[in-house]
Design a protein with these regions (language model features):
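Transmembrane helix-loop-helix hairpins at membrane boundaries of multipass inner-membrane proteins
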Residues: 1-10, 17-118, 201, 480-492
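Short helix-boundary/re-entrant hairpin motifs in multi-pass inner-membrane proteins
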Residues: 225-291
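Membrane-interfacial loop-to-helix junctions in multi-pass inner-membrane proteins
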Residues: 28-40, 104-122, 137-140, 158-178, ...
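Cytoplasmic/organellar membrane-interface segments at the starts of transmembrane helices
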Residues: 251, 371, 378-385, 429, ...
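Predominantly late transmembrane helices and immediately cytosolic-facing juxtamembrane segments
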Residues: 238, 345-362, 367, 420-453
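Short aromatic-rich membrane-water interface segments that cap or initiate transmembrane helices
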Residues: 2, 65-81, 204-221, 415-419
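Alpha-helical multi-pass transmembrane bundles of energy-transducing inner-membrane proteins
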Residues: 112-122, 126-216, 233, 306-370
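Interfacial segments of multi-pass membrane proteins
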Residues: 153, 203, 248, 275, ...
Length: 492
């Protein structure tokens, strides 16, 4: 077999073994360099694999063919996501090195700086494994690898509360993972297989409409409920969002540019892969879509209100993160919206990177993030320009990528005759503009008597994010067509 045949495995193994090397270096710069080279290599081989092997690759470990052995499967949907999250981590490592040193590793023992990069790569390997594997138990293993590393990452920050937040994350994340594991056990008992494609085939043959109301179907529904409950808990979707507010509030904001930027995208992919690839959609789509839609509406109302009422800059951004999960689940519950869903997730992910990077620059200079008593930012013209553009794009104002997506959401809801959902989305969008206005007032019109700070950290990260926003706006039509093509080729 040539190297290209091993790409599905290599893109998980490279960050995994690089994490081990980082742990053995005992040197901060060397571990950073190893992590950066590993992600660049990963990005290159993924792009090379797509260009030479097309958009579908299957890999069986030890030549044990599926469904007996463990299979990795790359398709039209997960390969672009893999490229994107590799890009996010590369951004974090290249453009955020100064902010990493000032806001994260500064509060870690000097002898353990290398472990930060090791844990970062372990988390990344877990995320890539979740995206790549076609085996349900392997899927669970990678969820746990990424989760265990993430628990430690979010515990690092200037506040002691970060450790308490990480403990909340640990407890609730463990409960969520346990529910997913129980669900996998049910599926194995029902089908005798752990291969996702094989389970899908078995369920389609044995669980058609002829068994509606039977004990068999009831057992399948129980398995589905366990999985969705666990996934929703890990995603912090309302009403199980409370742990994220506590955990993220105390975490160093720059680490959230990586974690928050990809967690929603990965969580939605995880649920979509489960709903569309593992089980027969027709059996459960209507009742579960109605349930998800009701939860999404509640999330949009409550999180937009809480974001508007919050007096802390960081909490406003965190509630905004939870709010976008509501938009995502609303689109997930509407069958024709799958392409629009991934457009929303990608643009929102870029928005979150920008907002948390912006917050990291500010929190590096002051602990006071109250919108009424925050210190005035002085003599930082480039920071103010980039901050204004970041807030402009995030607020979904006209002539931004998110504004175009919101218009498409409005059109979709009208076409589907979802009047209540349309009204809720309009209200949430107005609230979104209002709480972004609160952020702008705090950043640009703070009183000088509150004190003065000057942003002197490297602004390349913010500049890169604004550049990406402008690029996505200019090529929005082409991006939408590409996402639509990839989702239709995978999901139909």
């Amino acid at each position: 077999m040539t190297l290209i045949n091993h790409i599905p495995a290599l893109q998980v193994l490279i960050p995994f073994f690089s994490a081990l090397f980082c742990a053995l270096t005992f040197h901060k710069f060397t571990s950073w360099l190893i992590a950066t080279i590993a992600i660049i290599t990963n990005l290159v081989i993924t792009l090379y694999g797509i260009s030479t092997s097309g958009n579908f690759q299957s890999y069986s470990f030890g030549n044990w063919q599926a469904p007996i052995g463990i299979e990795y499967s790359l398709d039209y949907l997960n390969q672009p996501i893999i490229i994107y999250i590799n890009g996010v981590l590369l951004f974090f490592l290249l453009f955020g090195k100064q902010l990493i040193n000032k806001t994260i590793t500064k509060y870690i023992d000097d002898k353990k700086h290398h472990m930060f990069y090791s844990l970062l790569l372990f988390a990344h390997a877990g995320y890539l494994g979740v995206l790549s594997t076609n085996d349900l138990f392997n899927f669970y293993v990678f969820i746990e690898i990424s989760s265990l590393a993430t628990y430690v990452l979010v515990s690092k920050g200037k506040e002691a509360k970060a450790l308490i937040g990480a403990f909340d994350y640990l407890i609730l994340g463990t409960i969520g993972a346990t529910l997913i594991l129980i669900s996998i056990g049910f599926f194995f008992a029902i089908t005798g297989s752990l291969n996702i494609a094989d389970i899908s085939n078995i369920l389609q043959v044995n669980y058609g409409s002829s068994v509606a109301g039977s004990t068999k179907l009831h057992l399948l529904i129980i398995a589905i409920v366990f999985f969705l409950t666990g996934a929703i808990l890990k995603m912090a979707f309302f009403p199980l969002h409370f742990w994220m507010i506590r955990s993220y509030s105390a975490t160093a904001p720059f680490i959230l540019t990586y974690i928050a930027a990809i967690s929603s995208l990965l969580g939605i992919y995880m649920i979509m892969r489960f709903l569309y690839f593992t089980i027969e959609v027709n059996l459960i789509y209507i009742p579960f879509s109605l349930m998800l839609r009701a939860m999404a509406i509640t999330t949009l109302i409550i999180c937009s209100y809480l974001a508007l009422k919050s007096k802390n800059i960081k909490k406003i951004i965190i509630y905004s993160t939870a709010l976008q999960i509501g938009y995502a689940f609303l689109l997930l519950s509407i069958w024709p919206a799958k392409a629009l869903l991934f457009q929303l997730l990608i643009i929102d992910s870029v928005n979150k990177i920008g907002l948390f990077t912006l917050l990291a620059h500010i929190e590096n200079k002051t602990n006071n993030l109250d919108i009424y008593s925050i210190k005035q930012i002085k003599d930082s013209p480039w920071f103010k320009i980039l901050a204004a553009l970041t807030l402009l794009f995030s607020a979904s104002l006209p002539l931004t990528s998110m504004f175009i997506i919101k218009i498409k959401i409005f059109e979709l809801l009208i076409q589907q005759s979802l009047l209540l959902e349309f009204i809720i989305v309009v209200i949430a969008s107005v609230f979104g503009i209002l709480y972004h206005l609160k952020l702008a007032k705090a950043l640009f019109f703070a009183k000088e008597e509150n004190g003065v700070i000057q942003i002197d950290t490297n602004l390349l990260g913010l500049f890169a994010i604004v550049t990406v926003h402008i690029f996505t706006l200019l090529y929005m039509h082409e991006i939408a067509e590409m996402i639509g093509y990839h989702t239709s080729m995978t999901i139909g």
